[in-house]
């Protein structure tokens, strides 16, 4: 009796096994060639999801790192410009102090005025400087518009805005890359407090305002203090508010002058008849200080009121220097924050790369062993397939 053998079934089974082994070997070869454990998402869907998520985080980190480089370049340029402005303010203070020198002739003072005028022009050029992209550094968020210009009266006006340009350098931090020129150069704290002085001094007087403050922020009145000789070796004062006498008393240098919320302190030698008018001003513009210093330098060297105003200009230039120095320190602090943020991003990026490597990168020693095992299995399948292919019923007759 003939024995029936399902040769087709055996042939198909061995052929399928051969194909499976061939696919495994090809997969091992592709892994070894690419160095990657996962060649397509279907190899491990969960691992592929994590890899995709990590890649997105790495891409975001790279954007932050690129932003940090850009902001750092802008801030470093900003810091240098502020430092140059500091130097101009300090040099202007020195020149103005020299103008006060009583031994100076009118010609000497005019020579110093010309130097100051040159500094003022250079200062205006500096505050209108542009970065490598053509953006005006001190224009706030209007970088394409020149921020400072002189009007027909010679006063400097501001055409920018009061905001900072910012860029996102992390998910939680937007870093300012500039400071508006209005804040830096036109809103400088008044070194005399809440008021600025106007002097009407007698010959030989050395009287100067030291400080004047008022706790009543709504009091916008102008005050005038006039000093008189009390004929007892002391001075008295008369205080006017908007032209009306509101107080009179013996003057005490230690106590100063007090009226309601107003406090006025002076320094220097008083001459009977000296008068100081004070008007409200919490902040000042360094451009006005340049203009005023040059205007008062035209006065006679013997004009004590003009000399007192030049003293005021030296104090304002010094206050501007302090104000700019603080702004430069703030810019330096931002640069330090950028360095810290950059290091944090790089550390996190390294952690992500390690995590991604665990999911994605090939363990070569393990892969070589697997390739060797699959190659031997393929060889066995090929031998089995060869025998099955040659099998016929005549072998059993």
Language-model regions: role of each:
Residues 142-303:
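Cysteine-poor, low-complexity segments in flexible/peripheral regions
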Residues 1-153, 175, 291-397:
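Amphipathic alpha-helical polymerization modules
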């Amino acid at each position: 009796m003939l024995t029936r053998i399902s040769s087709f079934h055996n042939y198909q089974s061995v052929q399928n096994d051969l194909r499976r082994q061939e696919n495994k070997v090809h997969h091992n070869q592709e892994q070894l060639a690419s160095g990657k454990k996962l060649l397509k998402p279907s190899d491990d869907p969960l691992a592929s999801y994590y890899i995709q998520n990590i890649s997105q985080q790495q891409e975001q980190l790279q954007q932050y790192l690129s932003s940090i480089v850009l902001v750092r370049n802008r801030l470093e340029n900003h810091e240098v410009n502020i430092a140059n402005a500091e130097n101009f303010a300090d040099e202007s203070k020195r020149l103005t102090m020299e103008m006060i020198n009583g031994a100076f002739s009118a010609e000497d003072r005019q020579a110093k005025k010309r130097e100051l005028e040159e500094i003022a022009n250079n200062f205006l050029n500096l505050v209108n400087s542009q970065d490598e992209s053509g953006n005006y550094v001190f224009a706030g968020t209007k970088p394409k518009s020149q921020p400072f210009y002189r009007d027909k009266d010679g006063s400097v006006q501001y055409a920018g805005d009061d905001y900072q340009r910012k860029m996102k350098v992390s998910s939680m931090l937007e870093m300012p890359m500039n400071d508006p020129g209005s804040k830096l150069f036109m809103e400088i704290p008044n070194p005399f407090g809440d008021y600025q002085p106007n002097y009407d001094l007698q010959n030989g007087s050395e009287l100067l305002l030291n400080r004047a403050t008022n706790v009543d922020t709504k009091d916008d009145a102008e005050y005038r203090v006039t000093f008189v000789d009390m004929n007892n070796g002391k001075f008295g004062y008369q205080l006017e508010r908007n032209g009306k006498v509101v107080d009179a008393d013996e003057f005490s240098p230690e106590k100063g002058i007090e009226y309601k919320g107003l406090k006025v302190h002076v320094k220097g030698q008083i001459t009977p008849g000296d008068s100081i008018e004070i008007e409200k001003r919490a902040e000042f513009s360094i451009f006005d200080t340049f203009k005023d210093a040059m205007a008062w330098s035209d006065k006679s060297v013997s004009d004590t009121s003009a000399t007192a105003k030049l003293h005021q200009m030296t104090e304002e230039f010094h206050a501007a220097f302090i104000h700019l120095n603080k702004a430069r320190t703030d810019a330096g602090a931002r640069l330090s924050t950028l360095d810290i943020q950059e290091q944090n991003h790089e550390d996190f990026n390294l952690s992500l790369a390690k995590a991604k490597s665990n999911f994605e990168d090939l363990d070569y020693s393990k892969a070589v062993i697997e390739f060797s095992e699959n190659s031997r299995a393929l060889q066995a399948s090929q031998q089995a397939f060869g025998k099955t292919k040659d099998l016929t019923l005549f072998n059993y007759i």
